[in-house]
Amino acid sequence: MIKLYDLLVESKLRLNVPSDIKKIHKIFKKNGYKLYVVGGAVRDAILGKRPKDFDLATDAKPDEVLNIARKGGFKTLEVGKAFGVVLVGGHEIATFRKDIGKGRRPSAVDYTDIKGDVMRRDLTINALFYDMDKAEIVDLVGGIKDLKNKTIRTVGDAQERFDEDPLRKLRALRFAGSVGGRMDNEVAAAIKNDPSLKGVSSERIRDEFIKGIKKAKNTKKYLELSKNLRILPLILPGFNINLRFTKSNDYIVQIANLLRNENYQRVIDGLKGLKYTVQEVRDISFLI
């Protein structure tokens, strides 16, 4: 387990930040606040991918964010303000925070500093902050090293992170597949010992599973890992799953292959119950 403060890495990175974010950053800096690019955009840039979405984090409180942005002429939305998140110019800006309560939507938040914000994140590779002033990555948990080694590791105790939101188990699997790497032993053991997805909606499980298939460098290995960690039967509960995996990244083809031993009508009824769309159910059942 990596503990906060074990490691602080400041590594240079040339991140092509959109011009409107640069403008937002400029007015935050003018008003004495920090603004970082966080999470997936930083991870993808390190991997040599072009980031699609840019999430931002700041030490400014939500009301301060809104005030600064409006004075700067940016459109704002207060959706999520109670949880420290607002939209500025279409970009999500979150105040450094600690979640109170479990699950995807905490009951409340406490505001904190960058170190506290890092500790609420799921995986080390998603806990990287890009400092636009210095063109540097701030890494408090060894995420850069884990990315280079293609190792999936949680921030802090794995069981605690998964207890906060069990969907994180599927996210860990997805990222292990998408980077073509391995799962840290503690993370793998935590999932295998308690693969439960209790409290997670069928829609979220479906969406995460589909993303896992589509983004995996080797879908066969992704599914084998899901099976070995005893979580695959909870992704497709009630089915007799075919364990002869293929490498296709087409999730329709892949799910049809997983259910090839099942009765046609059971597939239709089961997938409907798991919130697959009418078209998805039709396409998958057609291939059975």
Stretch-by-stretch model annotation:
Residues 2-288:
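Catalytic cores of the polymerase beta-like nucleotidyltransferase superfamily
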